[in-house]
Amino acid sequence: MDFFPSEQARLQQFPVLQERLFLAHAGVCVLPNVAVEAMQEYLQRCALQQQEHEGVWRMVQQTRALSAAWLGAKASEIALLGPTSLGLSLVANGLDWRAGDEVIYHAQDYPANVYPWLNLQRQGVVLKALPTPRPGEITAELVEASLSQRTRLVALSSCHFLTGRRLPIDEIGRMLRARGVLFCLDAIQTLGAFPTSVEHVDFLSADSHKWLLGPMAAGVVYVREELQDQLRPSLLGAWNVCSPQFIAQSQIDFEPTARRYEPGVLNLVGIAGMRASMALLQEAGPAAISRQLLALGAHLRQGLEPLGFEFLLPGDDPLASGIVTMRQSSAMGPSMAKVGAHLRQRGIETSLRTSHQGGELLRFSPHYYNTLGEMQRVVDEIAAFCG
């Protein structure tokens, strides 16, 4: 799939390719050149003008609108905050909880989408872990069977960080909306890679430093318009409380949109980079990006499976993503740590992870700018090492 007019253009946009093959976007991504240039341009202007120089707020509004377009939301429903855990904590700490309220969560989720909810137990909130057969294997039927009359909110991730299985977001969200249960989504593992619609979602948080190809601590928080008066900001400052001419008032009146969750100065340099990366991905086409990620993952699986490795998610799973994670199925084969170290020596960067049972995992997460030829290089390197 041709996303670039030439190989030179691909290398210029992603200079990391001139040094190594980076396949760890599900961790912390490398930045495309457009993001670096946007951040440098902002910083260079800051040397000559104040940091809130002319054009900054236009850039912020454009980023808000672009984020809304990615999610199918309104710009008034978007706060520009990162990291992901900040947005999730704003939801957990902003609702008016009552003792006995229930929150359903996935105990084998990434920690950022576990601890904000566990912390609510201090207020008498009851936490119910989904009884999933395997990490990330969540269906609408499984969620519905866990609901009770006391269930207030369900907190899940759009894609599991280890298995790579995506969540059937619309199916679960539609069911929860019909039952009057709030739905909060950690979307960092799909936003920028796979369609992530908030049509049936109430709250969403995602930093840009993975599939959005943006910098760390620049992110997107979505709060459905109808719920903004219910979700009280837990962080207050001069920016999200109405303060005419920066004069403190005798009462607290919040900004009327999702800006009420932005208490102070924004991460403007990060937002500049995030906006540039989002525009780059928008130009490539979200649907085409998804197809490319599935093709890259399928090539890896097909080439590595004959070598005796076991994958956490079958290649024919309809909810597969750009994450491909494998483990050693033979006691005689090399450990994942050794395979990962060999690849690193050969200029290929992956992610060594640990399963919830303590076993070694090797995770591949290429992005749209990678090629099938590069995936074959990975297969060939591992085959030579294991042979």
Task: Please place each PLM-identified region on the residue numbering.
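Pyridoxal 5′-phosphate
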Residues: 1-387
